[in-house]
A protein has these predicted regions:
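Glycine-centered motif in EGF-like
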Residues: 1, 18-205
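Extended alpha-helical solenoid/rod scaffold regions
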Residues: 3, 11-13
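Eukaryotic short linear interaction motifs
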Residues: 8-10, 17-20
Length: 205
């Protein structure tokens, strides 16, 4: 089964709970299931497997492999995968837009976390700010939950208040990744651009 022509889920439907079955009567046996990225191989508009996609892919795979199949309905499995991948798509968009204006890199920091670093240059003030978004995943009730911990540090130039910059980013971006199309916060790129404008105005005073 594929989703968004980007990922493919392979599983044995017979090992999962049917809508009219008794969970208590099922044998608690988990059959192997797999989740692969297929977006790079499609003919129309192929999309490479990036570091952030790999992070989400592994996190989702670990989550669904931990589900008790005999007590889980297929619709709940599919929902967990789709909701989680929608969050991945939101992060992919955020990083892509952020990278348009600020050089951005991604580092894997553990099996369930990555660090997104971006450089904000404020040329009129000869100032460089390193922006970081630390993402950490864990299993939730419906797929994975991914926390966001933003921070900012002055590399050189004006000595702006680093905790306040981090607080600004947290307020604008939130502390958790939301599904693509359902976000209540601004994009990372817009938040960083707003921060740059505020710092420029403050530095000129």
């Amino acid at each position: 089964m594929t989703y968004r022509k980007e990922i493919e889920l392979v599983f044995d439907a017979s090992s999962f709970l049917s809508s009219n079955a008794n969970a208590a009567a099922r044998q608690p046996v988990n059959f192997r299931l797999d989740l692969w990225y297929i977006g790079a191989n499609r003919e129309l508009n192929p999309l490479p497997l990036t570091a952030e996609k790999e992070f989400f892919l592994q996190s989702i795979r670990d989550h669904i492999r931990g589900l008790p199949q005999a007590q889980t309905q297929v619709k709940d499995l599919l929902s967990a995968v789709s909701v989680s991948w929608n969050k991945a798509s939101a992060v992919v968009d955020d990083i892509r837009l952020l990278n348009v204006s600020c050089p951005t890199g991604i580092t894997k920091t553990s099996d369930n976390s990555i660090l997104v670093k971006s450089n904000l240059l404020i040329a009129p003030l000869t100032t460089k700010i390193e922006i970081s978004f630390h993402l950490t995943s864990q299993s939730g009730e419906n797929g994975i939950e991914v926390g966001i911990s933003p921070s900012a540090a002055v590399v050189y130039g004006e000595r702006f208040n680093e905790p306040k910059m981090g607080e600004f980013l947290l307020n604008r971006c939130g502390d958790a990744v939301e599904e693509k199309g359902h976000s209540t916060k601004v994009s990372w790129g817009n938040a960083v651009a707003e921060l740059g404008e505020k710092l420029l105005a403050r530095g000129r005073k």
